Swiss-Prot record:
InterPro entries: Class_I_gatase-like, GATASE, Imidazole-glycPsynth_HisH
Signal sequence segment: none
GO biological process, one term: L-histidine biosynthetic process
Compartments in which it is found: Cytoplasm
Key words of the record: Amino-acid biosynthesis, Cytoplasm, Glutamine amidotransferase, Histidine biosynthesis, Hydrolase, Lyase
Domain Glutamine amidotransferase type-1: 2-174
Transmembrane segments: none
Any GO molecular function: lyase activity
EC number: 4.3.2.10, 3.5.1.2
Protein task: IGPS catalyzes the conversion of PRFAR and glutamine to IGP, AICAR and glutamate. The HisH subunit catalyzes the hydrolysis of glutamine to glutamate and ammonia as part of the synthesis of IGP and AICAR. The resulting ammonia molecule is channeled to the active site of HisF.
Subunit field text: Heterodimer of HisH and HisF.
Protein's recorded name: Imidazole glycerol phosphate synthase subunit HisH
């Protein structure tokens, strides 16, 4: 099975590639439109700012390709945030608008920001993304921005506020 990890130049590619490899797949790291469209599954990791990642996607001519893919697509960290419609980061900017949600700054007077640590994740809706994973399992978080719980939320957690840990719309997951 063909698995592609989109390379925006703003991602933790080696850790994602290693994790996918441990599941028995040989992922390809690529910016090729052809490889992306021919793949069976797509991973879209990201680290850094929404502005730099959106700039990279535009420069690589991948904005419309990502919006048009039909195969399963998993956004990880910044990759998830870019699937939304708007980010408060960098004085606010429009993102890919694949799933209608804003990405908001995590604000807390009680806890340090960025949020850095392990949280229990509560599955809110039955979804293939969590097959074989026990409800309230721990996941690692390192972020300063959140997606509030919304109609696309399939799992949530809390750090000062409750927020989406995973969302799903059609073939797009985060």
């Amino acid at each position: 099975m063909s698995v592609v990890i989109i390379n925006t130049g703003c991602a933790n590619l080696s850790s994602v590639k290693y994790a996918i490899h441990r599941l028995g797949y040989n992922p390809v790291i690529s910016t090729s439109r052809r490889e992306i469209l021919r793949s069976k599954k797509i991973f879209f990791p990201g680290v850094g700012t929404a502005h730099s990642a959106m700039h990279a996607l535009k420069k690589l001519n991948l904005l419309n390709i990502i919006k048009d893919v039909q195969q399963p697509f998993l956004g990880i960290c910044l990759g998830m945030q870019l699937l939304g419609s708007y980010s408060e980061e960098s004085q606010g900017m429009h993102t890919l608008d694949i799933i209608n949600f804003p990405v908001c700054a995590l604000k807390s007077e009680k806890f340090p920001v960025p949020h850095n640590g392990w949280n229990n994740v509560e599955v809110c809706k039955n979804n293939i993304l969590f097959n074989g994973i026990k409800n309230n399992s721990k996941f690692y978080f390192l972020h300063s921005y959140v997606v509030h719980v919304n109609e696309y939320t399939i799992a949530k957690t809390a750090y000062n506020i409750c927020f989406s840990a995973a969302v799903n719309k059609d073939n797009f997951w985060r």
